[in-house]
Structure formats: C-alpha cells, structure tokens
C-alpha cells in the first residue's frame, strides 16, 4: 500500500465500478442516494478497495459507511496507523 493516499485514485476506482464520472465521486456523496450504487456495486467497490489499499473493512465499519467521505476517513486512519507502526 502507498504511504500517501490520493483521493483521485479512490475517485477513479469508484467511478469505474459505479459507471460514473470521477468528478461525481465527492466526499459528501452518499453511495446509494447520490451515486445510485446497489448492494452488488458496493460489494464490488469494497473488494476493490480492500485489494488496492491492502486493508480489511470489518462488517461493523461497513455498516457505518454511508458516504464516500466515510470510506476516505477509514482509509486515512488505516494509513496513519501503518505509518506509526
């Protein structure tokens, strides 16, 4: 995993999976309400994020993630933890 996160990478990944433009993927956007992601889209996105960023998203964390920003904060936290280790 890279030591520095780039939001544009997450935008591109989410846009590719959701079939939307990268600039539509913003921190304040809801996966389901704003980006029209269904449960299959979310499973695919989470699998891709776990692969790309070498993280595991526990189910209890997934249940809290409603916005792109929630996922981004989780990734920032995991990156910070790795840098401290």
Residue ranges and their predicted role:
Residues 2-41, 45-47, 51-85:
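Phosphopantetheine-dependent thiolation modules in NRPS/PKS and related acyl-activating systems
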């Amino acid at each position: 995993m890279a030591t520095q996160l780039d939001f544009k990478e997450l935008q591109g990944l989410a846009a590719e999976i959701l079939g939307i433009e990268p600039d539509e993927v913003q921190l304040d956007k809801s996966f389901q309400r704003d980006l029209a992601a269904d449960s299959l889209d979310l499973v695919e996105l989470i699998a891709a994020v776990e692969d790309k960023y070498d993280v595991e998203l526990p189910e209890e964390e997934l249940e809290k993630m409603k916005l792109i920003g929630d996922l981004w904060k989780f990734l920032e936290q995991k990156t910070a933890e790795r840098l401290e280790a």
